């Protein structure tokens, strides 16, 4: 508390020092100097007080952040980050991490849960090991392998800070010829307490330890937000540009398992001579805004509209364009162990072709696929009593999406241009949410497509969170339910390219999920369980012999999935034993393959080198999953597909690291895959035929600047 003495009065008011009190004091014309009475008027040589110089320019009072989106505890933070909802008048607060927690994990596909199964290196695609974390993209699914890199409206970051914030990160590894690089820069600044802008740029990629595996993955998000007392607007521009050389994986697992090649660049790959390459381009613009209409008289005591009855009217628009260009030339590869002679010796077989079909041109491919989406939403949100009430908000909205698809067809030889297919989908949605103090948080939602493209699609969802306290420690029990009926993606039914052609008629998928979790954050404990049932599952799988004979398949029946997840970080003094374990069961591994056990273990010792100045962590990270028929990856389709030829797993992938935080700077030194050649069976694959990186040294630095 402070004692603020008012000028010209003997009153003394004791009050809490917060934005709400200061604003009201300013409105009443009171002195808001945090240090009491301002300096007295200066005296002349005779000791007489001089008259202050009259000024016609009055200092403008700066309004504090009054938005109903943020609670008092969030406003008190020096910097915070959030994402905006596409459908509703809501935001989702996200952590702004500047600690040592997991900064050493430079591959984004390894940061959540037990991580993903990656194709290989930084910038390349991956698929989550946990089935319930896998992306379910109806729009341009070709980009889904890069889900952990891509910016879009759902994850474009907005910031609010009391001081300008700049953070730079640089990580590199390996020799210059094979180097992986990760450069990130983030700048966020407030124009006023309610208005801010930010720029996030990330460039991640590799020159490739293996032959023909160079990758560039660049992502940028530029956002502007104004979160006023009544009017709010969020706008952003997103660009994703990805270039990948596609080597098609090793000619045989023996090339990795038997360690014949001293350098990974000598490992023979199947598409090296074909010079296969994918280029993905994406531009997206979005704007969502809302205006509040209070249903009660707003007084000076009402700091925000969160505690009043109100109606909010809003509109959201998004334009998103994706394209993918796949190129290659006719090329063959040689398998040095393609067969055996009568004496049991390996015999090389030449002339292997990765693709069996060349529908358009016999010597070269250039397949370009493009998808555009214009989305409009008009929504209303009612706040019957207050935003944190038992019934806090009731939402409803309508919208339509205009989808435009273009690809080459034989008829385009006559017209000289690609034919475009346009489809329009109409939908309506609604939700209701509420709270009971800090102990109960609940919501339910529904979305339906009554007609048009995707007509008949529907989704239902519900969420309940119960929060209690034991000796001051929060205990959180959550449950979720969802049921979704969704149409197949356009490209799953329609594709014409040099290597693949199909015109399918697929039924809608129907999936039901139930999730329960229990968390004790102060003790780093988390338990979770998922149960799912999928009917008419659509997937990529084999339609003939060989890896390239892949097509879209649909399972006529139900598949049941069960997942159990446990996370516990044990701490004994400075020793940390962080454990994450996932168990999964699938009733049909040919349709939805999952490993029985997946684990991420991180054991390290943390200590102060110089108290409150330099803190270090020294330890190791390990990843493991049991053997299963892991998915393969098809470059022309940019898709993971099910296969039953090669089992992958039973290999521990271990890194050793030293990480430190010195004031605002974070640094780390790491040797990745330190156990290569020391222990393990040598099968360091995570995706069929795609080996993980062999050992390499990495170093990184991240520095935050303020003001």
Spans of model-derived segments:
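Short Gly/charged-rich anion-binding patches and loops
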Residues: 1, 219, 653
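Single conserved hydrophobic/aromatic residue that forms the stacking wall/gate
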Residues: 1-15
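Residue-level signal for the start and early helices of compact helical domains
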Residues: 2, 156-159, 186, 431, ...
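Glycine-centered flexibility sites
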Residues: 5-8, 208, 700
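Low-complexity, intrinsically disordered/propeptide-like segments
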Residues: 9-11, 20, 25-26, 37, ...
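Exposed, low-structure sequence patches enriched in small/polar residues
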Residues: 13, 135-136, 161-163, 272-335, ...
């Amino acid at each position: 508390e402070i004692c603020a003495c008012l000028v010209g009065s003997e009153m003394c008011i004791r009050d809490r020092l917060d934005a709400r009190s200061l604003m009201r004091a300013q409105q009443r014309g009171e002195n808001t100097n945090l240090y009491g009475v301002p300096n007295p008027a200066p005296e002349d040589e005779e000791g007489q007080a001089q008259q202050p110089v009259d000024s016609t320019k009055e200092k403008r009072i700066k309004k504090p952040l009054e938005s109903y989106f943020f609670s008092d505890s969030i406003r008190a933070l020096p910097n915070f980050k959030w994402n905006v909802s596409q459908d509703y008048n809501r935001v989702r607060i996200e952590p702004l991490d500047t600690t040592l927690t997991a900064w050493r994990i430079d591959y984004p596909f390894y940061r959540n849960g037990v991580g993903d199964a990656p194709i290989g290196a930084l910038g390349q695609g991956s698929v989550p090991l946990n089935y319930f974390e896998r992306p379910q993209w109806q729009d341009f699914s070709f980009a889904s392998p890069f889900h952990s890199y891509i910016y879009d409206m759902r994850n474009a970051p907005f910031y609010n800070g009391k001081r300008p914030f700049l953070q730079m990160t640089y990580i590199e590894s390996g020799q210059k010829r094979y180097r992986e690089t990760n450069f990130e820069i983030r700048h966020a600044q407030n124009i006023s307490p309610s208005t801010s802008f930010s720029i996030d740029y990330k460039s991640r990629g590799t020159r490739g330890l293996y032959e023909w595996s160079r990758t560039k993955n660049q992502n940028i998000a530029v956002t502007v937000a104004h979160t006023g007392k009544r009017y709010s607007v969020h706008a952003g521009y997103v660009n994703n540009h990805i270039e990948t050389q596609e080597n098609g994986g090793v000619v045989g697992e023996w090339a990795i398992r038997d360690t014949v090649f001293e350098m990974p660049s000598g490992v023979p790959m199947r598409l090296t001579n074909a010079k296969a390459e994918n280029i993905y381009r994406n531009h997206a613009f979005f704007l969502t805004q809302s205006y509040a209409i209070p249903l009660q008289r707003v007084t000076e005591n009402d700091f925000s509209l969160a505690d009043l009855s109100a109606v909010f009217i809003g509109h959201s628009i998004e334009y998103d364009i994706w394209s993918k260009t796949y190129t290659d030339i006719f090329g063959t590869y040689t398998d040095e162990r393609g067969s055996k002679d009568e004496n049991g010796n390996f015999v090389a077989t030449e002339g292997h072709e990765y693709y069996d079909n060349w529908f358009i041109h016999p010597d070269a491919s250039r397949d370009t696929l493009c998808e555009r989406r214009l989305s409009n939403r008009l929504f209303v949100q009612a706040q019957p009593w207050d935003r944190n009430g038992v019934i806090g908000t009731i939402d409803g909205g309508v919208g339509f999406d205009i989808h435009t698809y273009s690809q080459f067809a034989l008829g385009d030889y006559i017209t000289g241009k690609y034919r475009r297919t346009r489809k329009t989908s109409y939908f309506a949605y609604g939700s209701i949410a509420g709270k009971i103090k800090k102990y109960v948080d609940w919501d339910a939602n529904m979305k339906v497509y009554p007609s048009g493209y995707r007509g008949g699609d529907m989704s239902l969802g519900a969420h309940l969170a119960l929060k209690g306290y034991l000796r001051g420690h929060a205990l959180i029990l959550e449950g979720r339910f969802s049921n979704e009926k969704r149409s197949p993606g356009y490209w799953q039914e329609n594709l014409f390219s040099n290597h693949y052609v199909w015109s399918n008629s697929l039924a809608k998928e129907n999936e039901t999920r139930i999730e329960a979790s229990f968390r004790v954050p102060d003790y780093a404990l988390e338990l979770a369980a998922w149960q799912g049932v999928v009917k008419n599952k659509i997937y990529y799988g084999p339609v003939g012999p060989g890896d390239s004979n892949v097509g879209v398949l649909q399972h006529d029946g139900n598949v049941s999935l069960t997942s159990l997840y446990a996370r516990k970080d044990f701490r004994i003094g400075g020793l940390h034993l962080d454990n994450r374990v996932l168990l999964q069961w699938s009733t049909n591994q040919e349709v939805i393959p999952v490993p029985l056990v997946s684990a991420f273990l991180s054991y390290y010792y943390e200590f102060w080198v110089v108290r409150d100045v330099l803190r270090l962590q020294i330890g190791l990270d390990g990843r493991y999953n049991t053997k299963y028929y892991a998915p393969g990856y098809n470059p022309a389709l940019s898709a993971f597909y099910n296969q039953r030829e090669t089992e992958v797993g039973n290999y521990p992938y271990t890194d050793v690291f030293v990480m430190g935080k010195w004031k605002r700077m974070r640094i780390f030194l790491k040797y990745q895959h330190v156990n290569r050649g020391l222990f393990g069976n040598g099968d360091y694959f995570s995706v069929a035929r795609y080996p993980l990186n062999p050992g390499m040294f990495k170093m990184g630095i991240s520095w935050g600047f303020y003001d």
